[in-house]
Amino acid sequence: MSFLKTTTVVVTLTAGLLLSTVAQAHPKLLSSTPAEGSDAAAPSKIELHFSENLTTQFSGAKLIMTDMPGMPNSPMGVKAGVSGGGDPKTMVITPTSPLTTGTYKVEWRAVSSDTHPITGNFSFKVK
């Protein structure tokens, strides 16, 4: 094979690998406030920071109280609004009422430009 043909094959294969990697990229949760597993005062909002810009109309989250002192019932949903943050890589959950002492779980769904939904969850405690 000539040098030119070999170079063309190598460049084509490299470009194909790079494009397939970009096409398969999905948003990843990089951090949250409060952080996963944290034990802190009640936050007025919960921020989720992702690795990619989110498509807000297809992304969302639920806030669930999973445990509290004297809680005899099953986990219960907490009313909260979900919106994009000032940064397109941020999702903000704002409870409609102050959070009380207990354990909370955030279940999130993130969709970026590749349109594949990625889901996850994390928990934190409120003192």
Name each model-derived stretch:
Residues 1-11:
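Bacterial N-terminal signal peptides that target proteins for export
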Residues 20-22:
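N-terminal signal peptide c-region/cleavage motif recognized by signal peptidases
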Residues 24-62:
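N-terminal non-catalytic regions of secreted/periplasmic and cell-surface proteins
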Residues 38, 52-124:
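Acidic, low-complexity Ser/Thr/Gly/Pro-rich repeat segments typical of extracellular/periplasmic
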